[in-house]
Design a protein with these regions (language model features):
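A recurrent flexible, glycine/aromatic-enriched loop bordering the glycosyltransferase active site
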Residues: 94-110, 117, 126-127
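Short, well-formed alpha-helical segments that are part of the catalytic scaffolds
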Residues: 12-28
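A conserved hydrophobic helix/loop-capping motif in glycosyltransferases and polysaccharide synthases
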Residues: 4-12
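Conserved donor-nucleotide/metal-binding helix-loop-beta segment in metal-dependent transferases, i.e.
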Residues: 78-100
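Cell-envelope/extracellular polymer assembly enzymes that use nucleotide-activated donors
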Residues: 2-4, 35, 134
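Active-site-proximal specificity loops/subdomain of glycosyltransferases
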Residues: 31-64
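C-terminal catalytic/acceptor-binding lobe
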Residues: 19, 127, 133-226
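Short beta-strand-to-loop acidic/aromatic patch adjacent to the donor-nucleotide binding site
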Residues: 63-77
Length: 226
């Protein structure tokens, strides 16, 4: 089965090159039929991690593929961490390979059919944070199984398993904390499903500005989110 690794990206060229030159060869060896798509968002708007991942999924849009979200600054260090990526994931499950305790951020694996059912990430989380909590909200709404292997706050374990670079860029915070952490659960199931259907893969609008091949199994698309 094909596995698509999606890297949301902007202005982190050193981190990207490190990942492609050091981590990717190990992942290619462990995961048959692995392809990588780097989704680079243009400037002019705050970075939108959720929408860029949605675009990476939409580019292939196959219910039967595995997908892995991969932050560009996180690199598996030891064979056990590499093997986490190769774990099989059944339908209706999200596997948090490296994620927060109550969100689906960082490195997450799922089947295309599962991501499609939850309508992916919302598209209106501009700036840093909270889109990963929204994805977990959607997973819970659809009674998806959620498994976490290593969480952000397990400091000793994450240092053992991953090499993580510091982000020295100024982070512009997303102002939708209440939507993700408080308001979602206040709504009825009927209102939740309306909100999910009206914001995600089905409402995604973007334009591909440029496509390029970085390596034989690595493609980069530069996109404008509309």
């Amino acid at each position: 089965m094909k596995t698509i690794l999606i890297i949301p990206y902007r202005d982190r060229v050193n981190h990207l090159m490190y990942f492609l030159n050091n981590s990717l060869p190990k992942l290619v060896e462990a995961i048959p039929n692995l392809e990588v798509i780097v989704v680079e968002q243009t400037h002019g708007k705050r970075f939108n991690r959720g929408a860029t991942i949605n675009i990476g999924y939409d580019y292939y849009k196959n219910d039967d593929y595995y997908y892995i979200t991969q932050d560009v600054d996180v690199n598996p260090q030891i064979p056990e961490a590499i093997n986490f990526y190769a774990n099989e994931v059944k339908d209706n499950k999200f596997l948090g390979i490296y994620s927060d305790g109550d969100t689906l951020g960082g490195i997450v694996k799922f089947l295309g059919s599962t991501f499609s059912k939850t309508n992916g990430f919302p598209n209106d989380y501009w700036g840093w944070g909270h889109e990963d909590k929204e994805l977990e909200n959607r997973a819970r709404h659809f009674n998806c199984e959620i498994e976490k292997l290593i969480t952000f706050h397990e400091f000793d374990r994450k240092k053992k398993y991953f090499k993580i670079f510091e982000d020295n860029h100024i982070r512009e915070e997303c102002g939708k904390w209440h939507d993700a952490y408080a308001n979602f659960d206040r709504h009825s199931k009927d209102v939740q499903i309306i909100n999910i259907k009206n914001n995600g893969l089905t409402t995604l609008k973007y334009k591909i500005i440029k496509e390029s091949i970085l390596k034989p199994n690595v493609k980069k698309i530069k996109v404008e989110i509309l």
